[in-house]
A protein has these predicted regions:
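Short, gly/Ser/Thr-rich active-site loops of penicillin-recognizing serine hydrolases
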Residues: 295-304, 328, 356-426, 490-492
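Short, conserved catalytic-motif segment at the N-terminal edge
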Residues: 24-81, 100-108, 151-152, 156, ...
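Short solvent-exposed beta->alpha transition segments
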Residues: 408-450
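Short, surface-exposed loop or secondary-structure junction motifs
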Residues: 56-68, 121-338
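Boundary at the C-terminal end of the N-terminal hydrophobic targeting segment
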Residues: 18-22
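Short, well-ordered beta-strand elements
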Residues: 333, 343-359, 467-471, 480-486
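Exposed beta-sheet edge and beta->alpha loop/turn motif
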Residues: 448-492
Length: 492
């Protein structure tokens, strides 16, 4: 496919979302227009799209075009699409669950759980497969057509030996075969087919009743059939049933169902303050964004007039992970397949996600998906989460105010390096210089956390603001290891 817990712990992630507040009408209309323009420009028969907000679920959605060219049947909200490689995150999270339960280790050798690789795949680890670092050759054209491969034939393929294009563990190279192997590992350690294990752990708890791996589960009147544009007309792609390669790209779902999955991913943020309890399942979801391998650069896909942005990307667990110039930290994945093309994007630190599902071969709706979240961000609707204030930072507010008003850094607990790096006299001079610009700052500061041991203290003063960046040391009691001052002049 082309890449464009325990029940109690899992239940902590499944609180019913609050009533969804719709997007502002003008913004919603702009997103819808962008989706339809992209579909027309790329000759896509039909598509569905959605915008998801953490805690609220699907806040906007739309459909366009036809689900079946021959029957001229339109796409509807309950139309089901294959999502191809967007399946991989379901597989990875299920594997992480099993690891958390002690049924395997991510650094296990693959041969421990799949004996058929003995002799040629002894060096492979589970982690290699998760991050596409197994040394297998990129296999999109071949791998897509392997979806219905039966278990016995897959075993025969593995026993015969698979050639490597490079040594395992060196670099990222996308491999559908690797995720098919993860499906086999899930089967072997759980004792049931990966489809059943994923459905038990993912689909059913989230209420994704319209989601499955098997076309036989889909009423024909609800299926978006797959098409390719060839010789100036639409050609029907053959349907492929379930099989061993479904773990890399076999999920069939609807827009509303997939929105539940996106909301589930977003619900794992923000993380609890260190030392505070949270459901282990939240940390397991966040582990999907823990990438490995050397970062690769990609230009942010867009069809809008936004500024170019180079995004450094690594591969996590079924998700690509990077830092965008506008959205901040992002996770995303495409899904290309004979007859289908899809894309998803989340910005976990602001709590928003978007997705597009289509029924054209290898359609890559990345650009309108990114454009939608960028438009929401630029409209001021998606600020980053405010990090909770730790006791260490909160307790520093009063000492910091004394430091500013007296010039004596001794009013705060100091780490051993603090006065070595800049002595008390120079630090007093720094404070005098900045207060000369700002004037009196009579009230205690506000505090903004960057982490449990890092933050900014800010004072509203007679002439603008004073902002102090404070970094605490990793000591049992709070001690300043760094302190930097800056003055922000008043706005004209």
């Amino acid at each position: 496919v082309r890449a464009l817990l325990t029940p109690l712990a899992f239940g902590a992630l499944l609180a019913a979302p609050a009533a969804a507040a719709p997007l502002p009408p003008e913004l919603a209309a702009s997103i819808d227009r962008s989706m339809r323009e992209w579909a027309e420009a790329n000759q896509v028969p039909g598509l569905t799209w959605g915008i998801v907000k953490r805690g609220e679920g699907l806040v906007h959605s739309g459909v366009s075009g036809i689900a079946d060219v021959d029957a001229a049947r339109p796409v509807e909200a309950n139309t089901r699409f294959r999502i191809a490689s967007m399946t991989k995150a379901f597989t990875a999270l299920t594997l992480f669950d099993l690891a958390g339960e002690g049924k395997l280790r991510l650094d296990d050798k693959v041969v421990t759980h799949v004996p058929e690789v003995a002799g040629w795949g002894d060096a492979l680890t589970v982690t290699d497969l998760v991050h596409h670092m197994g040394g297998f050759v990129t296999d999109d054209p071949w791998g897509d057509r392997q979806t219905p491969l039966p278990e016995a034939q897959f075993s025969a393929l593995l026993k015969s030996g698979v050639p490597f294009t490079r040594a395992p563990g060196l670099i990222h190279e996308y491999s559908n075969l690797g995720y098919a192997l993860l499906g086999r590992i899930i089967r072997n350690v759980s004792g049931q087919p990966f489809e059943a294990e994923i459905a038990k752990r993912r689909f059913r708890p989230l209420g994704m009743a319209a989601t499955s791996f098997d076309l036989a589960d889909v009423p024909r009147a609800l299926l978006a059939s797959g098409w390719r544009w060839e010789d100036g007309k639409w050609q029907r792609e053959p349907d492929m049933g379930p099989g061993t390669f479904g773990a890399m790209g076999g999920v069939i779902t609807t827009g509303p169902d997939y929105a539940k999955w996106v909301g589930h991913l977003l619900s794992a943020w923000p993380a609890a303050v260190p030392g505070e309890a949270e459901a282990p399942a939240r940390a397991t979801v966040r582990a999907l964004l823990r990438g490995e391998g050397s970062p690769r650069r990609m230009m942010r896909p867009t069809q809008a007039a936004s500024s170019p942005c180079a995004v450094a990307v690594v591969y996590g667990g079924g998700l690509r992970v990077g830092d965008d110039c506008t959205l901040g930290r992002v996770a995303f994945h495409g899904g290309g397949y004979p007859g289908y093309g899809s894309y998803m994007l989340i910005a976990p630190e602001s709590g928003w996600g978007a997705f597009v599902l289509t029924n054209r071969t290898y359609a890559g709706p990345a650009a309108p998906t990114w454009d939608a979240l960028i438009a929401i961000r630029e409209a001021g609707l998606a600020p980053n989460d405010v990090l909770p204030l730790s006791p260490a930072l909160a307790g520093l507010a009063e000492p910091m105010h004394k430091v500013l008003t007296t010039g004596d850094v001794g009013n705060a607990g100091l780490a051993v390096n603090f006065l070595m790096d800049r002595d008390a006299a120079h630090r007093r001079a720094d404070i005098a210089a900045i207060t000369a610009k700002a004037g009196r700052c009579p009230n205690p500061p506000g505090v903004s956390a960057r982490g449990a041991l890092e933050g900014e203290f800010w004072w509203k003063c007679e002439r603008g603001m004073i902002i102090a960046y404070a970094l605490l040391a990793p000591t049992p009691t709070p001690q300043l290891q760094a302190l930097e001052w800056r003055w922000q002049p008043p706005k004209p």
